[in-house]
Design a protein with these regions (language model features):
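Thiamine diphosphate
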Residues: 1-195
Length: 195
């Protein structure tokens, strides 16, 4: 299992524009990889899909994506729905990222296991740690949803990393690629609300 930990440092908010630019680059790379595998050209102009369940932690990214023409956004009713739609989009050759909060991870563990793990579907999650205290390691949070998020991912052997600031956005394409390589779920945890 590959888990990324670093020395403690104060997390910083990541600008929405930086995340969106990183997602665009990630989707471009994914499309090029699919083309190299023999997939034909995309029948549309957008680069990839964001599947979200209403998420206050990453709301600035989702609001900015509403104006973004290069990335399609689909708001789903549940994380289970988002995961199964992601499986269908992947089967059709479409790059896709799920943006959820930690509560949604807990709510959709069976789908994570059944679709992404047992079905060997590469699902990449960006998980917002709502109520994460800036001055504490998430595993020491007084909020159980924050405190148990990483241990839950560890229990299911889901590789994950923390996005603790702008210098960590390189983890988005890294863990996206890892989900494809291992044919299963990976996640990055968004430490603070995006700006």
């Amino acid at each position: 299992m590959r888990t990324f930990h670093r020395e403690a440092r104060m997390p910083e908010s990541i600008p929405a524009s930086l995340i969106i630019d990183t997602l665009k680059d990630t989707f471009r790379e994914a499309r090029a990889a699919r083309a190299a595998e023999g997939w034909g050209p995309s029948p549309h102009e957008h680069l990839g899909w964001i599947l979200s369940v209403p998420d206050t932690h990453q709301k600035t990214v989702l609001a900015a994506l509403d104006k973004e023409q290069a990335i399609r956004v689909l708001t789903c009713a549940t994380e289970d729905e988002a995961c199964t739609i992601a499986a269908g989009l992947h089967a059709g050759g479409e790059p896709v990222v799920l943006m959820i909060q930690h509560a949604g991870l807990y709510a959709s563990v069976n789908t994570l296991r059944g679709v992404a793990m047992d079905g060997k579907v590469p699902v990449f999650y960006m998980i917002g740690l709502l109520q994460r205290e800036k001055d504490k390691d998430p595993k020491e949070s007084r909020h159980s949803m924050v405190r148990y998020c990483e241990p839950l991912l560890d229990t299911f052997s889901v590789p994950h990393a923390r996005l603790e600031g702008p210098n960590d956005v390189h983890l988005i394409p890294e863990y996206y690629r890892l989900s494809r390589q291992r044919r299963g779920p990976t996640a990055v945890l968004v430490g603070l609300e995006t700006s």
